[in-house]
Amino acid sequence: MSRIGKSPIPIPDKVSVSLDGLAVTVKGPKGELKRTLPDGVTVNQVDNTIVVAPTSEKRQSRERHGLCRTLVANMIEGVSKGYSKKLEIVGVGSRAQVKGKTLVVSAGYSHPVEMLAPEGITFAVENNTNVTVSGTDKELVGNEAAKIRAIRPPEPYKGKGIKYAGERILRKAGKSGKK
């Protein structure tokens, strides 16, 4: 049995959870999330907690036990608090700006790169170099932040590019001069 899966998930105030078999719907102040969990687990609501249990002792069922518990916990936290990822743009002339729901990134290419925010995701830019991706779905926030970082990943020589806030870039020494 999974150590993570064993612990019940508390449901905070202002959050409602509805279960329909393996379909879980969570509504809260920040929005609503729906997800269908894979087979091999059962989800029950006991008082103000959600309990996830494996249906059998098969390996696949035990593997999915902790995963499903974490997915439901992330949904509950997402609709109550929300998630955000911060990115930093490093380099001369590199900047970002928001136009409506579109993030426009100038990262040293011959053209600016435009990214449309999917439903449930918002982009915010501070000082033209700090981008914040926020939303209720943890997976979607992480994927969008990774797509932005992939526009110009940080390079190891000067550290230019788009990196996560707090990310350490392993620096390399440049060419050594002629001897």
Swiss-Prot record:
GO terms for molecular function: rRNA binding; structural constituent of ribosome. Gene3D superfamilies: Ribosomal protein L6, alpha-beta domain. It comes from the Bacteria. It holds the Pfam family Ribosomal_L6. PROSITE patterns: RIBOSOMAL_L6_1. Keywords: Ribonucleoprotein, Ribosomal protein, RNA-binding, rRNA-binding. The keyword Iron-sulfur does not apply. Transmembrane segments: none annotated. This protein binds to the 23S rRNA, and is important in its secondary structure. It is located near the subunit interface in the base of the L7/L12 stalk, and near the tRNA binding site of the peptidyltransferase center. Belongs to the universal ribosomal protein uL6 family. PANTHER family: 60S/50S RIBOSOMAL PROTEIN L6/L9 (PTHR11655), LARGE RIBOSOMAL SUBUNIT PROTEIN UL6M (PTHR11655:SF14). This is Large ribosomal subunit protein uL6.
